[in-house]
Amino acid sequence: MRDDRVILSWFGVASYAASFNGHVVLVDAWVPRGSHSGYVPTDPREVAQLDPEYIFVGHGDFDHVADAAEIVAISGAAIVGTRAHCDSIEEQLGEKVKCVAVPEAPGFAEELRDLIPGVEVSAVAHIHSSFESPEFADGNRLPCPPIWNPGDTAQNPPTPEDFAHLIRHLPDPRGGNVLYQFRVDELAITWHDTVGKLREDAPEVIEKLRKLPPTDVHLAAILAFGQATNCLRSLGMYVRALDPDIFTPTHHDNFTYLIGANAKDLEPYVRDEIGRLPKRARPRIRYTYDPHAYLKPKLFTFDPSAPRWRD
């Protein structure tokens, strides 16, 4: 593992294995399965063998941290998240976990400068996506609900064990929503695994995001309940607030029944939302496709000292 690079490897939904200065962490922790098996070419035990030092939790729904307890049991990783996230994982594990608690109330933030040597981390509490009333006056967007592809299930049928795991974790509590920014040398990466309608429900979060150091790479969830009425309007609020140089969608794969969708089918909507920004403010889009981009660290290997990141 190179200690002079920042490396991220996607393993489904918004979960990444990441290396910062040679220190391995996870952001979210679920290998998608249950509606299929083997679609993502890894499993929780293999992820745990990366020996992560921390698991940064965005929120506690099944599709984000259903494997956290198992990975903690094998690796001893500490949890970074709200107290509710830690409590949920402790309940699943049946024992205490190392917990670095961050604020849960939207708009509150915390600086975590001593977790990873040479890495500064900002944790900002924000809000989950929600159903929205149509906002035709704000860009005249059409609905773009995800269209599930049952072909992936037919080609990769779920094992009884994987299906049972999915069902068992469906009730997992959300426990708050946290956005993280990781800063190494000149490089700043901002990641979040949901997008709420900030303008109406949490304008204080927009102000917090604008005050973060400039974002170079923005990894943002696409799936949102608001798609049913306003397509990716909520996503646009985060992109406008963070003003990144590079944008990469996440949580845009066919991860489960009915609400999953293939990345290729969501791509036109992502490009439309980014295209609504003024031309000078549009980030470059680094689009990824399931299942081809899973476990492809070359897609997200960065030299944090490169001049291109200097503002």
Where are these regions (language model features)?
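Residues that mark the start of a beta-strand
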Residues: 7, 23-24, 120, 179, ...
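Metallo-beta-lactamase
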Residues: 3, 83-178, 184-185, 289, ...
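Active-site neighborhood of phospho(di)ester-bond hydrolases with catalytic His/Asp-centered motifs
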Residues: 26-30, 51-61, 80-83, 189-195, ...
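Pre-active-site segment of Zn-dependent metallo-hydrolases
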Residues: 17-61, 66-73, 96, 129-157, ...
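Binuclear metal-ion centers of metallo-dependent hydrolases, dominated by the metallo-beta-lactamase
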Residues: 78-79, 86-115, 232-311
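Active-site-proximal loop/helix segments of hydrolase catalytic cores
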Residues: 160-240
